[in-house]
Amino acid sequence: MKSRGLVVVGILATITLVLTSCQALYLPNQPNVPLMSEGDELQVGMSVGSTGYGAQLAYSPYYHWAITANGNTFSVNNGGSFSTNRSFQHLYGEAGTGFYTRVNKYLRFEALAGFGSGYSFDTLTKRLYRKLYFQPTFGYSGPVFDFGFTPRLSHVLNYRNKVNDVPQTMNNAAMFLEPCLTARVGYEQFKFQIQGGLSFPLGGTNFTYRNRFISMGFHLTFVKDFEKYK
């Protein structure tokens, strides 16, 4: 059993290494998929993957209303992991809100929309972009296992570049379809999480992008009680 776990970790690490070897303006982030069940519910997640290190936060002030925030940071350093000489850096953050409901005891539906902003930076050029997104999710949430399918739509606008600190106004926009699978396994309050998805441009693009993403990490849920799962 232990050897199987090591094999899985090794495979995921290899995939992540391959994906992160490609530098691009737009690195699609893993969506925030809370699969909430009640009001006054708080969820926190941390992950590592093809877009670097990520953090996710979700809160429901009232039943049917969710507020989310998440971000990612990723960099490639010349001279090793502890070097300050960065050849590439990517930073992105977003916030969203929307509707969710319990279809029945375990099935969930949620529809979130939001805004994000980020940049990609190499030794010469800093490329800034904004994103508007809409993400419906169809999922299952239980005491041991969670699963969700999220066909996200993202509108990405590369609005400015800085070449040697000289700003250049840009207007490069593209729409992406980004289907993603989310799986979590563990206990009621603590679960391990893995997410993976693809990114397809709906038309032409005038900037570079990564066409897939994967991450793994953990997910915490804080609620008044867990009677909803029983």
Name each model feature, range by range.
Residues 7, 48-49, 218:
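Short hydrophobic/aromatic segments of transmembrane alpha-helices and their interfaces
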Residues 1-30, 225-230:
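Cleavable N-terminal export/targeting peptides
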Residues 59, 64-155:
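Gram-negative (and chloroplast) outer-membrane scaffold detector with strong preference
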Residues 36-44, 53, 63-65, 105-111, ...:
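Outer-envelope beta-barrel architecture signal
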Residues 116-230:
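Outer-membrane beta-barrel transmembrane domain signature
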Residues 22-81, 223:
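Short glycine/proline- and aromatic-enriched beta-strand/turn motifs that initiate or cap beta-hairpins
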Residues 38-40, 51, 91, 132, ...:
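Residues that act as N-cap/strand-start positions at coil-to-secondary-structure junctions
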Residues 10-16, 52-54, 78-86:
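Intrinsically disordered, low-complexity coil segments
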